[in-house]
Amino acid sequence: MTNMRKSHPLIKIVNHSFIDLPAPSNISAWWNFGSLLGVCLGLQILTGLFLAMHYTADTTTAFSSVTHICRDVNYGWLIRYMHANGASMFFIFLYFHIGRGIYYGSYSFMDTWNIGVLLLFAVMATAFMGYVLPWGQMSFWGATVITNLLSAIPYIGPTLVEWIWGGFSVDKATWTRFFAFHFILPCIITAMVMIHLLFLHETGSNNPSGMNSDSDKIPFHPYYTIKDILGVLFMMITLVSLVMFSPDLLGDPDNYTPANPLNTPPHIKPEWYFLFAYAILRSIPNKLGGVLALVFSILILVLFPILHSSKQRSMSFRPLSQCLMWMLVANLLVLTWIGGQPVEHPFITIGQVASVTYFFTILILMPSTALMENKLLKW
């Protein structure tokens, strides 16, 4: 009798993806973030579903319904803060996952990489719409400012903004459609994750050396399942500690004030995980230029396979490229800090310098350094 996991049509798929999957024997903890993102997605869908049971997407009752969830629903505060801080964890892991892909040259798997970039856009859209839902001051003004950026699109811009708003300002129609999209997008993300994995399993995983590892593979289970479980445990300890001890650490105090269209907050800013892109947007005085820079700051990831000029895939044995990689990380941290500061001197100048450095490092410094390394190695 054949083993059921190898013969059953459905279980066979799971077996080939998570049990008998040949994996490189030398992948490090940097490869844990894929599974952690999967756990985060499941957690977000689950907590989001329970929140949706009590939330009302109406401008008059949205803020009260969130208060009701925290005060009156059994463990509602826990579900709400797990969902809010779970989003932060999601983005931390997402950025680590992308960073690992850049460092070890995983972008060479172009299909997997491009689906990943689309996934990033989908997750960012979902997070933005989720931030808008509690109908606090920052929710309302964040929605107004970010949707209003589309008015920079020539000719169709103003009409497009009013179409998204469902009126002449952010109001009930906007809230209802944002809630609908926030609810459906995670399902689309789940489908995209499956395509992401499908493409990945066509080629097999990359490894820290960047070399072909077909001659040295081990089964995914039990070696990497146990390693992933350890990662999940660390993640849950961090998330639960954050939720229990300081749930509002990553939030904005302005969002505890009900939305008021007549009163603008002194400093409108998005959640911390969008601050780097927000800083790039603000660093350009022209509206259309700012919007293009904002989009391109994420879309630039698509260019990594094209810009790769080194004869080696990974940065493991390329010290000069490693220096540039960490310079890029430091630059992104500076941009994140600047995005949270008011628009005044010296923050404006620092933001502009950091924005130029960001694009200059990726488009010019990294490819030219890789070519120089080839020369030094006489390749």
From Swiss-Prot:
Cofactor: heme b
Annotated compartments: Mitochondrion inner membrane
Residues engaged in binding a ubiquinone: H201
Known partners and oligomeric status: The cytochrome bc1 complex contains 11 subunits: 3 respiratory subunits (MT-CYB, CYC1 and UQCRFS1), 2 core proteins (UQCRC1 and UQCRC2) and 6 low-molecular weight proteins (UQCRH/QCR6, UQCRB/QCR7, UQCRQ/QCR8, UQCR10/QCR9, UQCR11/QCR10 and a cleavage product of UQCRFS1). This cytochrome bc1 complex then forms a dimer.
GO CC annotations, alphabetized: mitochondrial inner membrane; respiratory chain complex III
Main location: mitochondrion
Note: Heme 1 (or BL or b562) is low-potential and absorbs at about 562 nm, and heme 2 (or BH or b566) is high-potential and absorbs at about 566 nm.
Keyword annotations: Electron transport, Heme, Iron, Membrane, Metal-binding, Mitochondrion, Mitochondrion inner membrane, Respiratory chain, Transmembrane, Transmembrane helix, Transport, Ubiquinone
Protein name: Cytochrome b
Binding site for heme b b566: H97, H196
Family: Belongs to the cytochrome b family.
Top-rank taxon, per record: Eukaryota
Gene behind this protein: MT-CYB
Function: Component of the ubiquinol-cytochrome c reductase complex (complex III or cytochrome b-c1 complex) that is part of the mitochondrial respiratory chain. The b-c1 complex mediates electron transfer from ubiquinol to cytochrome c. Contributes to the generation of a proton gradient across the mitochondrial membrane that is then used for ATP synthesis.
Topology versus the membrane: Multi-pass membrane protein
Biological process, per Gene Ontology: mitochondrial electron transport, ubiquinol to cytochrome c
Cofactor note: Binds 2 heme b groups non-covalently.
SUPFAM superfamilies registered for this protein in UniProt: a domain/subunit of cytochrome bc1 complex (Ubiquinol-cytochrome c reductase), Transmembrane di-heme cytochromes
One of the Pfam families matching this protein, by short name: Cytochrome_B
